[in-house]
């Protein structure tokens, strides 16, 4: 039942510090609205200790597709709807930056970046469960050992997706997949949703840059620093 899965997700969000207890009712109502429900689950929700929200999200995504909230046959729409769900359980950009700066000032930069990385995992922006399915091996070459990885978080496009992309009118927003206007973007068939995406401002040589983690993790704690202006 969708309402029960919503309660499971709220429990996960609370235990992982995504949603404060004071914000739980607001988050619950936002999720109920997203799924077209008028009331929450009335029973007790069993206590769980989940590392990742994948199982809950899969159940909610299956239910959302059945309700016609998105085309379940198109993987990109499924991934985009997942970001929409988790975006309702995240602190806003300003709150993320405030927490990051507070941790950096009180406990140092490692504590701040560790918190930010965990936030990206807990919100499934970094798709850790899928990354664990990556196929990886080493092979010897004349230049030394080469590590090869087949990244399972970026599946090949299916024929329906390719056909829909051809019908999609060109859009110049966001300018690229790294620009800061990606924060909270709903996505489209040829552009990933970023409602569960946050960035941290950093100053380098007196200029404004931003720090983010890569959702695909080509190497451990793969991060990206980009300029405030698209260049």
Language-model regions, residue ranges each:
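Active-site microenvironments that recognize anionic phosphate/pyrophosphate groups
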Residues: 1-230
